[in-house]
């Protein structure tokens, strides 16, 4: 299987966890997009009933228009049964780096509230330790971004403000904030680093998702591999 086939395979495998009367948290990214498409097809064919998706606000309108998945906002639900999302890195203890799509704050809120959090990745996202390949996205208040860059130097991080593609200026999140991408030498204690980064004044949230994933479905050339905490 090539990478796209791996993504499709894990997206289909995640459908096995869907049952009637579920509220499903939905993230962003290309692999999650396949899952959302397949979930919409299941609903359309009547294979499951009374399914509602809860995506980050920036995705709500697009989901209603494109997928056929009924959508609710986070404040309209009392609980989320399952959340399904991708990741940029997954370490051996199922800690994650997420946030290349700049929706990390709302994704973390949704996934923290979920009864079960299922992560969909291809095998290239598996790493020996976090920050092996990808930086940690950090959502920051715009007025504080320069001060936070200086603060991150204490951690020996190579950090930079994420700039927009096909637009002038920095990337702006759905919350009106900026994103700093911080590449640390390595992260040996993800939970401690996640907490410590969030204590920096001006940081809204960061892309370390420690001790939150329950199941990781990994697309490999041989098929889908299931990892559990």
UniProtKB/Swiss-Prot annotation:
Recall the taxonomic lineage recorded for the source organism.
Answer: Archaea, Methanobacteriati, Methanobacteriota, Thermococci, Thermococcales
Q: Which NCBIfam families would you find in this protein's record?
A: PRK00702.1, rpiA
Keyword Isomerase in annotation:
yes
Record Gene3D superfamilies: 3.30.70.260, 3.40.50.1360
- Please state which protein family the record places this protein in: Belongs to the ribose 5-phosphate isomerase family.
Q: Provide the active-site residues from the annotation.
A: 107
Membrane-spanning segments: none
Q: Which GO terms describe its biological process?
A: D-ribose metabolic process; pentose-phosphate shunt, non-oxidative branch
Pathway(s) of this molecule = Carbohydrate degradation; pentose phosphate pathway; D-ribose 5-phosphate from D-ribulose 5-phosphate (non-oxidative stage): step 1/1
Q: Which organism is it from?
A: Pyrococcus furiosus (strain ATCC 43587 / DSM 3638 / JCM 8422 / Vc1)
GO molecular-function term, one example from the UniProt record: ribose-5-phosphate isomerase activity
Q: What is its EC number?
A: 5.3.1.6
Please provide an example of a Pfam family that matches this protein in its UniProt record.
Answer: Rib_5-P_isom_A
- The cysteines covalently paired via disulfide bonds are none
Q: Which reaction does it catalyse?
A: aldehydo-D-ribose 5-phosphate = D-ribulose 5-phosphate
Name it: Ribose-5-phosphate isomerase A
This protein's UniProt keywords: Isomerase
CC terms in the record's Gene Ontology section: cytosol
Kindly state the subunit structure of this protein: Homodimer.
**InterPro entries with a match to the protein in the record:** NagB/RpiA_transferase-like, Ribose5P_isomerase_typA_subgr, Ribose5P_isomerase_type_A
Family matches, as HAMAP family: Rib_5P_isom_A (MF_00170)
**Which amino acid positions bind substrate, per UniProt?**
28-31, 85-88, 98-101, 125
Function per UniProt: Catalyzes the reversible conversion of ribose-5-phosphate to ribulose 5-phosphate.
């Amino acid at each position: 299987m090539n990478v796209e086939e791996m993504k499709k395979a894990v997206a289909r495998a995640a459908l096995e966890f869907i049952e009637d009367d579920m509220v499903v948290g939905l993230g962003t990214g290309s692999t999650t997009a396949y899952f959302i498409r397949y979930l919409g097809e299941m609903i359309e064919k009547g294979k499951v009933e009374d399914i509602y998706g809860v995506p980050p606000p920036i995705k709500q309108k697009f989901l209603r228009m494109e997928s056929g998945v009924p959508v609710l906002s986070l404040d309209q639900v009392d609980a989320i049964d399952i959340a399904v999302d991708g990741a940029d890195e997954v370490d051996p203890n199922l800690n994650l780096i997420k946030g290349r799509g700049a929706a990390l704050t709302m994704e973390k809120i949704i996934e923290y509230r979920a009864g079960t959090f299922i992560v969909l990745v291809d095998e290239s996202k598996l790493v020996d330790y976090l920050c092996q390949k990808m930086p940690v996205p950090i959502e920051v208040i715009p007025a504080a971004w320069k001060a936070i860059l200086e603060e991150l130097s204490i951690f020996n991080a190579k950090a930079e403000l994420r700039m927009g593609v096909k637009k002038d200026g920095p990337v702006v999140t759905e919350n009106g904030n900026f994103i700093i991408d911080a590449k640390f030498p390595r992260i040996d204690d993800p939970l401690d680093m996640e907490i410590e980064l969030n204590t920096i004044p001006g940081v809204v949230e960061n892309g370390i998702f420690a001790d939150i994933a329950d199941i990781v479905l990994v697309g490999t050339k041989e098929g889908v591999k299931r990892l559990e905490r």
